[in-house]
C-alpha cells in the first residue's frame, strides 16, 4: 500500500507481483491509474482494475476435468472403486471451486458414482495445515478410490498419511509428487514458475502484457504427468485417452463464461 502511495520516480518503471488469493480485492488496487508502475496479480481473472494492473490465471477446470475423467474411467469396472474424495483448503475460493467443478464433471462423465468434497478450514489458513489434513483423512476413513488434494502446502499431510497410516491412492499437485509416496498415481502440474518467468522476461524486454489472460490445457502450462513407475502401466494409457476430451471441455468452459 505504501508503494502504491509513493510518488513516481522519473525514468523508473516499478513492478509489484501479488497473489490474487490475498490481494485481488485490495482497495488500493481499485483506485486510479498507476502511471509507469505495473502490478501483476496471479491466480486472478478479469480486468476490472485500473490501467497498470494485469492479471493472469492458470485455469484449473480443464486439467481437473482430465484428472477426474481418468479416475472415473479407472473405476468403471468395480463398485469398490466408484467413489472419490476431494479435499479442499477452504470454501468459496474461485480457483478451488473451478477445480472441484472440473474434477467432478470429468469423474461423472466417465461413469464415477460418488464424488465427495470436504473442506479443511473456513479461510486461507487451510493452505498451511498439513497436520489437520492428516487427521481429517483419519476421520473420513477408507473407501475412496483416489484423493484429489486441493490444499496447497496442506497436501503434505495427505501424502504423509498415505505413507504412515493407510496407503491411499492420491493425485499429486502442482509438481510431480511421485517421489513423495508410492500412493501418487499421477500429478496435476501447474507450471507457475514458467509463466512468471515469461511475464518477467517480457517486462524486462519492454513488451506489453495482455490486460488479463487465462491459460488452460491447450497452453501447455498445466498438464498431467504419470508417475514414472506407472509409465508403462494401464494408468498411462487412460491418462492419454482422456486428454483430447479434457482440452475440448476446457475450451467450452472458458467460452461459456464470455
State what each model feature region is:
Residues 1-258:
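A residue-level marker of the well-folded mature domains of exported/periplasmic proteins
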Amino acid at each position: 500500500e505504501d508503494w502504491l502511495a509513493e510518488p513516481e520516480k522519473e525514468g523508473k518503471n516499478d513492478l509489484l507481483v501479488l497473489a490474487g488469493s490475498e490481494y485481488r480485492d485490495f482497495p488500493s488496487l481499485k483506485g486510479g491509474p498507476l502511471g509507469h508502475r505495473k502490478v501483476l496479480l496471479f491466480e486472478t481473472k478479469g480486468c476490472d482494475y485500473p490501467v497498470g494492473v494485469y492479471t493472469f490465471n492458470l485455469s484449473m477446470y480443464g486439467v481437473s476435468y482430465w484428472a477426474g475423467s481418468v479416475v472415473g474411467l479407472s473405476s468403471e469396472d468395480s463398485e469398490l472403486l466408484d467413489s472419490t474424495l476431494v479435499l479442499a483448503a477452504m470454501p468459496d475460493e474461485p480457483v478451488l471451486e473451478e477445480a472441484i467443478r472440473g474434477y467432478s464433471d470429468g469423474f461423472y462423465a466417465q461413469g464415477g458414482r460418488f464424488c465427495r468434497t470436504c473442506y479443511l478450514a473456513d479461510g486461507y489458513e487451510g493452505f498451511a495445515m498439513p497436520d489437520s489434513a492428516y487427521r481429517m483423512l483419519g476421520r473420513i476413513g477408507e473407501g475412496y478410490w483416489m484423493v484429489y488434494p486441493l490444499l496447497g502446502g496442506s497436501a503434505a499431510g495427505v501424502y504423509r498419511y498415505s505413507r504412515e497410516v493407510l496407503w491411499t491412492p492420491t493425485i499429486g499437485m502442482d509438481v510431480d509428487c511421485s517421489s513423495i509416496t508410492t500412493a501418487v498415481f499421477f500429478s496435476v502440474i501447474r507450471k507457475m514458475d514458467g509463466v512468471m518467468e515469461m511475464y518477467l522476461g517480457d517486462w524486462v524486454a519492454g513488451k506489453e502484457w495482455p490486460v488479463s489472460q487465462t491459460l488452460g490445457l491447450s497452453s501447455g502450462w498445466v498438464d498431467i504427468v504419470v508417475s514414472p513407475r506407472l509409465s508403462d502401466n494401464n494408468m498411462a494409457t487412460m491418462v492419454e485417452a482422456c486428454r483430447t476430451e479434457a482440452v475440448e471441455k476446457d475450451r467450452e468452459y472458458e467460452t461459456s463464461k464470455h
